[in-house]
Amino acid sequence: MTPHINAPAGAFADVVLMPGDPLRAKYIAETFLDQPELVTDVRNMLGYTGSYKGRRISVMGHGMGIPSCSIYSKELITEYGVKKIIRVGSCGAVRQDVHVRDVIIGLGACTDSKVNRIRFRDNDFAAIADFGMAQAAVQAAKNKKIKVHVGNLFSADLFYTPDVEMFDVMEKYGILGVEMEAAGIYGVAAEFGAKALSICTVSDHIRSGEQTSSEERQTTFNEMIEIALESVLLGDND
């Protein structure tokens, strides 16, 4: 057990899907996993372990922002032996060719957070996904005929940013989605010898104002989940 996870040793699979919302973790477990078992509920940050097509897999919420997701991902890796983390979350879009409900596979994550600089002795750290995991996710999407965007995310520290002109810079640099966790999870995985990938569904468009409801974010976005789960099976076959 840890201060934030009350699961016993061995309760988690070596691969954990991590949405931000613990209710989305509950939905994923109950909808996609066979015989899901609740293994942790500290602070109502729900975590489950079950199986998908016979493969043992866990799912657990990580909360909002880099500080929260860094705590949970670090403890899963160092205390529970987790080898791979797949963030399955929502993001905002700034580009006109990226639409609400589109799926993004985050090869890398820019950020305005200093957490990776703190880890990396004040040097820039290239927060990137594991190539094999990204490759498997792209292949899983192709197999299911799901269109995906593949490229950079931006992990922001502020949800309500005062620097709205930064969205113009993001669009210029080809940022596909704006969220709050990927860069932190990639940094934690690198520091502690694990692998990570972020797959996001566009929940709102920052330019057009189009958005999904909180209920939709909890109980839909199934294509992203299917890609993540199928990518685990493909990764096992490599």
UniProtKB/Swiss-Prot annotation:
Residues the UniProt record annotates as site (Important for catalytic activity): R217
KW Phosphoprotein (keyword) present: no
Keyword list, A-Z: Glycosyltransferase, Transferase
InterPro entries: DeoD-type (IPR004402), Nucleoside_phosphorylase_CS (IPR018016), Nucleoside_phosphorylase_d (IPR000845), Nucleoside_phosphorylase_sf (IPR035994)
GO molecular function, one term: purine-nucleoside phosphorylase activity
Active site: residue positions: D204 (proton donor)
One GO BP annotation of this record: purine nucleoside catabolic process
GO cellular component, one term: cytosol
Reactions this protein catalyses: a purine D-ribonucleoside + phosphate = a purine nucleobase + alpha-D-ribose 1-phosphate; a purine 2'-deoxy-D-ribonucleoside + phosphate = a purine nucleobase + 2-deoxy-alpha-D-ribose 1-phosphate
EC number of the protein: 2.4.2.1
Gene3D superfamilies: Nucleoside phosphorylase domain (3.40.50.1580)
Record field: transmembrane: none
CDD domains per UniProt: PNP_EcPNPI-like
Alphabetized PROSITE patterns for the sequence: PNP_UDP_1
Residues the record lists as binding phosphate: G20, R24, R43, R87, V88, G89, S90
Residues bound to a purine D-ribonucleoside: H4, E179, M180, E181, S203, D204
Assembly with partners or alone: Homohexamer; trimer of homodimers.
Function: Catalyzes the reversible phosphorolytic breakdown of the N-glycosidic bond in the beta-(deoxy)ribonucleoside molecules, with the formation of the corresponding free purine bases and pentose-1-phosphate.
Family: Belongs to the PNP/UDP phosphorylase family.
Name under which the protein is recorded: Purine nucleoside phosphorylase DeoD-type
Organism encoding this protein: Actinobacillus succinogenes (strain ATCC 55618 / DSM 22257 / CCUG 43843 / 130Z)
This protein's encoding gene: deoD
